[in-house]
């Protein structure tokens, strides 16, 4: 009997504003998938002309086969760390997709047009209050994303974080990842 293997292709869009580490988060996610989980991955990014405060987007496509089209069309996973990003991208999500928002920064009064699983997590508050470093909210988010979606393994993500963050910040970033992973365990 000839069994056809189902291809796995997941499209992830991370969005927010400049200065939140959206691009770095996408790089870390792509690196975890490609280098440590032995998957195919491509990461693209775009941001406004402002150095900080403008729109920022990082997209990652992860597949178990070569990626023939590197752009995200209908994300399976959407992360929004700003209201502007949520308002702009909420209706792009695939039916049955997963949406993660920073509950302190994003109002979800207007839901996506399709059925999704929505997680509201205070990424920035966790980074500020528990790690005393608001800048690691993006890494808190990656912890929750990893736990909730299993898109990459926890171990691969930890290795990719160590590869990607500035020297001297590894411990704080791993703590941020761990906090995000733990808070998602309770959801």
From Swiss-Prot:
Annotated keywords: Oxidoreductase
One Pfam family this sequence matches: POR
SUPFAM superfamilies found in the cross-reference section: Pyruvate-ferredoxin oxidoreductase, PFOR, domain III
Native species: Methanocaldococcus jannaschii (strain ATCC 43067 / DSM 2661 / JAL-1 / JCM 10045 / NBRC 100440)
Tree of life domain: Archaea
PANTHER family in UniProt: 2-OXOGLUTARATE SYNTHASE SUBUNIT KORC
Reaction catalyzed: 2 oxidized [2Fe-2S]-[ferredoxin] + 2-oxoglutarate + CoA = succinyl-CoA + 2 reduced [2Fe-2S]-[ferredoxin] + CO2 + H(+)
Self-association state and partner proteins as the record states: Heterotetramer of the KorA, KorB, KorC and KorD subunits.
Protein name: 2-oxoglutarate synthase subunit KorC
The protein's Enzyme Commission number: 1.2.7.3
An MF annotation (GO) of this entry: 2-oxoglutarate synthase activity
Gene that produces this protein: korC
């Amino acid at each position: 009997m000839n069994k056809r293997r189902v291809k796995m292709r997941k499209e992830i869009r991370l969005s927010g504003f400049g200065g939140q580490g959206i691009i770095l988060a996408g790089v870390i996610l792509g690196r975890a998938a490609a280098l440590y989980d032995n998957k195919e991955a491509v990461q693209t990014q775009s941001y406004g002309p402002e150095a900080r405060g403008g729109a920022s987007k990082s997209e990652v496509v992860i597949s178990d086969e070569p990626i023939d089209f590197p752009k995200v069309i209908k994300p399976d996973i959407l992360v929004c760390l700003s209201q502007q990003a949520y308002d702009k991208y909420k209706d792009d999500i695939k039916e049955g997709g997963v949406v993660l928002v920073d509950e302190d920064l994003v109002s979800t009064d207007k839901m996506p047009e399709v059925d999704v699983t929505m997680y509201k997590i205070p990424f920035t508050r966790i980074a500020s209050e528990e790690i005393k470093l608001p800048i690691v909210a993006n890494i808190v988010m990656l912890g929750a994303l990893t736990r909730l979606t299993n898109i990459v393994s926890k171990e691969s993500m930890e290795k990719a974080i160590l590869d990607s963050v500035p020297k001297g910040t590894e411990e704080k970033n791993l703590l941020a990842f761990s906090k995000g992973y733990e808070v998602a365990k309770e959801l």
